[in-house]
């Protein structure tokens, strides 16, 4: 069903960069050469290889909990994926030209995978995006479409009417035609006609990964086939060490339009020629126990979730849910996207230890879309490690252990970076910081993207940074400026926050994540710490999501008063800060990105415009 509504270069062979052997005295963290080799030059070639070598092997199993609450399994083989992707590719070339973008706005499911693979087979540039919610306009989708200006939008019959309303937003220039909207499931995917995979070009660019950011200034990271394949090689090497391949059977509920969801759910299974078990994010949110159950029942060995996913699994998975199930085969559960909470990891490992989940399976990881997805994690076979740092020292940019018994910021280690070259840099002077001094994390490697789509100025500032007087063995550039603050402490990487999100209260710097972690020890739910202006300076405000628990209004009022007192006391004691306002709201009130990170600037706007519905108004 259809309704009317350049990047181009030769394919590149992906190889792991061989980094210099020179060491930086303060922080010798050069990436090492991978043990893995990958001769294919594009993701399309890798799909063709999987279909050729393992045509009848299950490629993707999607568990549909909407059709059946017990889970209805849909399966496609590698031959079917390749065949259907080729049919989609031929359809695309009816309307597309070389270098065109093709947006994917479809529900989580096999059709999304076929659509994405079809764009790659056609040699066009994929733009994976979320499906819009019915009746709710999503400005982020509109902005990404306007920025990428696709000639075609791929979707499914069930949502084509809603998706078609977004097509006019995809016109980057005045007078440009709206893109064609194609429902993938309405194509004759079972056609037996002859198909020629060699007719399509193999450009260097694979897809645009839109990052969580401003709705008015979307950032589409241009990722090449080389970037993606390189990062897969790095990821496999760092997560599983000397093994020849990534653990089989990944389980994922992460959305396909998210960088880790795309990598773990779609790309890694293809590169490894194994079977992925998938479900939708909504299926997980409705019943978090499904995640652990799928890991056990499919004997999966690798999965991933942001911090809130671990919290939900702990709170909403019962012993009855896990009866007779075993997690002893799980080797890797990646946690990242948002700041990793040490207490959350401890609760998670304790909760599932009775079902043989090893604490060494939990892998705190650092990455970002600008580096494809992955940058660093600690080595395999090691339980998560954390260090409690002195708050006051961190506020002045120094990492020192908190004295015994004193309050501090408990930060998780991301190990010594091996896949990429990492430096900690003073963002003002652009000179390397010594170990123990907080600075901006700069990254270098073949996994670093080509830049931001149609934004040369921001590309130059972010992807082309150069060091001033680099240390021996360190190149001048180009470097990726991540915008993340971190420190090398005892040879390992720790993340302290974001440059743009530092709270300046009473003239001192404070990391909002530290304050949020203190509050979460009391409340357990989502929280955001923000600084809002008053007449003379900025004041600290905390917004806390709470479930209603009081049986009567009076009980609820007393509970809210107690929480407010405990939060104010804990912040004063741990951070030597006075909280100007403790706002308590219902779950789901705090704005978040597609990956679950709190949107601090949006929270400030809502607070200043009195848009939060406060539970504590009654207290």
From Swiss-Prot:
<dbReference type="GO" id="GO:0070566">
    <property type="term" value="F:adenylyltransferase activity"/>
</dbReference>
<keyword id="KW-0276">Fatty acid metabolism</keyword>
<dbReference type="GO" id="GO:0006633">
    <property type="term" value="P:fatty acid biosynthetic process"/>
</dbReference>
<comment type="pathway">
    <text>Lipid metabolism; fatty acid biosynthesis.</text>
</comment>
<keyword id="KW-0436">Ligase</keyword>
<comment type="function">
    <text>Catalyzes the activation of long-chain fatty acids as acyl-adenylates (acyl-AMP), which are then transferred to the multifunctional polyketide synthase PpsA for further chain extension. Involved in the biosynthesis of phenolphthiocerol, which is an important intermediate in the biosynthesis of phenolic glycolipid (PGL), also called mycosid B.</text>
</comment>
<dbReference type="InterPro" id="IPR045851">
    <property type="entry name" value="AMP-bd_C_sf"/>
</dbReference>
<dbReference type="InterPro" id="IPR025110">
    <property type="entry name" value="AMP-bd_C"/>
</dbReference>
<dbReference type="GO" id="GO:0016878">
    <property type="term" value="F:acid-thiol ligase activity"/>
</dbReference>
<keyword id="KW-0547">Nucleotide-binding</keyword>
<dbReference type="Pfam" id="PF00501">
    <property type="entry name" value="AMP-binding"/>
</dbReference>
<dbReference type="GO" id="GO:0097040">
    <property type="term" value="P:phthiocerol biosynthetic process"/>
</dbReference>
<dbReference type="InterPro" id="IPR040097">
    <property type="entry name" value="FAAL/FAAC"/>
</dbReference>
<dbReference type="InterPro" id="IPR000873">
    <property type="entry name" value="AMP-dep_synth/lig_dom"/>
</dbReference>
<dbReference type="GO" id="GO:0016874">
    <property type="term" value="F:ligase activity"/>
</dbReference>
<dbReference type="GO" id="GO:0008610">
    <property type="term" value="P:lipid biosynthetic process"/>
</dbReference>
<dbReference type="GO" id="GO:0005524">
    <property type="term" value="F:ATP binding"/>
</dbReference>
<protein>
    <recommendedName>
        <fullName>4-hydroxyphenylalkanoate adenylyltransferase</fullName>
        <ecNumber>6.2.1.51</ecNumber>
    </recommendedName>
</protein>
<dbReference type="Pfam" id="PF23024">
    <property type="entry name" value="AMP-dom_DIP2-like"/>
</dbReference>
<dbReference type="GO" id="GO:0071766">
    <property type="term" value="P:Actinobacterium-type cell wall biogenesis"/>
</dbReference>
<comment type="similarity">
    <text>Belongs to the ATP-dependent AMP-binding enzyme family.</text>
</comment>
<dbReference type="InterPro" id="IPR042099">
    <property type="entry name" value="ANL_N_sf"/>
</dbReference>
<keyword id="KW-0443">Lipid metabolism</keyword>
<keyword id="KW-0067">ATP-binding</keyword>
């Amino acid at each position: 069903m259809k309704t009317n509504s350049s990047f181009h270069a030769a394919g590149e062979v992906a190889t792991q960069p061989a980094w210099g052997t020179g060491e930086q005295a303060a922080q010798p963290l050069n990436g090492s050469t991978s043990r893995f080799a990958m001769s294919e030059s594009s993701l399309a070639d890798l799909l063709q290889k999987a279909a050729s070598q393992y045509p009848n092997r299950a490629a993707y199993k999607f568990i549909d909990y909407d059709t059946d609450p017990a889970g209805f399994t849909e399966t496609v083989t590698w031959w079917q994926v390749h065949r259907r992707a080729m049919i989609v590719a031929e359809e695309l070339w009816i309307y597309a030209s070389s270098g065109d973008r093709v947006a994917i706005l479809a529900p989580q499911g096999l059709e999304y995978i076929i659509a994405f693979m079809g764009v790659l087979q056609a040699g066009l540039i994929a733009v994976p995006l979320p499906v819009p919610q019915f009746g709710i306009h999503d400005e982020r989708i509109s902005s990404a479409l306007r920025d990428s200006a696709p000639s075609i939008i791929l979707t499914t019959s069930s949502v084509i009417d809603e998706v078609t309303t977004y097509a006019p937003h995809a016109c980057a220039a005045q007078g440009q035609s709206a893109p064609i909207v194609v429902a993938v499931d309405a194509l004759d995917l079972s056609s037996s006609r002859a198909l020629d995979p060699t007719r399509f070009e193999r450009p260097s660019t694979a897809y645009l990964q839109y990052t969580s950011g401003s709705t008015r200034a979307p950032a589409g990271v241009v990722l090449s086939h080389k970037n993606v394949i390189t990062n897969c090689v790095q990821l496999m090497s760092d997560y599983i060490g000397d093994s020849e391949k990534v653990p089989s059977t990944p389980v994922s509920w992460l959305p396909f339009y998210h960088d880790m969801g795309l990598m773990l759910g779609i790309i890694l299974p293809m590169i490894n020629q194994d079977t992925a078990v998938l479900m939708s994010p909504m299926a997980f949110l409705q019943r978090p126990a499904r995640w652990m159950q799928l890991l056990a029942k499919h004997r999966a060995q690798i999965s991933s979730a942001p911090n809130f996913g671990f919290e939900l699994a702990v709170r909403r998975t019962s012993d009855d849910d896990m009866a007779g199930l075993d997690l002893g085969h799980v080797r890797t559960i990646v946690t990242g996207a948002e700041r990793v909470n040490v207490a959350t990891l401890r609760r998670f490992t304790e909760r599932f230890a009775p079902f043989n989940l090893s604490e060494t399976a939990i892998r705190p990881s650092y990455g970002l879309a600008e580096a494809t997805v992955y940058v660093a994690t600690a080595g395999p076979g090691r339980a998560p490690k954390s260090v409690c740092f002195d708050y006051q020292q961190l506020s002045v940019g120094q990492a020192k252990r908190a004295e015994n018994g004193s309050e501090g910021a408990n930060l998780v280690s991301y190990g010594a970076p091996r896949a990429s070259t990492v430096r900690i840099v003073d963002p003002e002077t652009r000179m390397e910081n010594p170990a123990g001094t907080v600075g901006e994390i700069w990254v270098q490697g073949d996994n670093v993207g080509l830049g931001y789509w149609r934004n040369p100025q921001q590309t130059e500032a972010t992807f082309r940074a150069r060091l001033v007087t680099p240390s021996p063995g360190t190149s001048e550039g180009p470097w990726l400026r991540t915008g993340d603050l971190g420190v090398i402490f005892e040879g390992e990487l720790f993340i302290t926050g974001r440059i743009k999100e530092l709270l300046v209260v009473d003239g001192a710097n404070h990391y909002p994540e530290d304050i949020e972690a203190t509050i979460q020890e009391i409340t357990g739910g989502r929280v955001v710490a923000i600084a809002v202006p008053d007449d003379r300076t900025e004041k600290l405000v905390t917004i806390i999501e709470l479930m209603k628990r009081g049986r009567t209004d009076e009980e609820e009022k007393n509970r809210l008063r107690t929480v407010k007192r405990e939060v104010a006391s804990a912040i004063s004691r741990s951070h030597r800060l006075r909280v100007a306002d403790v706002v308590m709201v219902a779950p789901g009130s705090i704005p978040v990105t597609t990956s679950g990170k709190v949107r601090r600037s949006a929270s400030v706007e809502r607070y200043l415009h009195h848009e939060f519905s406060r539970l504590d108004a009654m207290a």
